[in-house]
């Protein structure tokens, strides 16, 4: 946060995946174009009960991980956070409303996923475990894609979209089009989803 500085002092840090020693939990915070390379490298590092929590944008992330790690425990997830890299080693978080939303791995029903929830809660990180994670991932995808498309079309910021009726109308049109795509694969979003998204953007 702008008025709060947090210094992290990890017990171990590396940029080489093969130096990880049988982790219990792997949080994937990478760009989607690195996903295949990273998951292939993880094959020889993780153990059978390692839980993987991917925080990447996209609706196909879990399937892509399963391709390289077919037997792994994966908690599908998405994250809402307003932050950017201020300078090397420093991330500026501009809002205290960050949230991780995750679901259970349906192929591993006997795993106690609530223990993961406890880890984040104890670290004061907002974490929500939900039953219908596919819906939540689609919500995030539509949110990001719609704003990105509209911002690119008008070469403007989030704020400019929300304060201009023409731009905001375009945003709503893009929202509805992507919502129809979701519906075509049986993902149904709430009727007031657009209004909910505007509140989140504010």
Q: Which ranges hold each PLM region?
A:
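Conserved N-terminal glycine-rich FAD pyrophosphate-binding loop of Rossmann-like flavoproteins
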Residues: 1
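Short, intrinsically disordered, charge-balanced linker/junction segments flanking boundaries
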Residues: 194-202
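Rossmann-like NAD(P)(H) cofactor-binding subdomain of soluble oxidoreductases
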Residues: 4-90
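Internal alpha-helical scaffold of NAD(P)-dependent oxidoreductase catalytic cores
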Residues: 45, 68-73, 88-192
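Short, solvent-exposed loop/turn elements at beta->coil junctions and helix N-caps
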Residues: 81, 132-135, 198-199
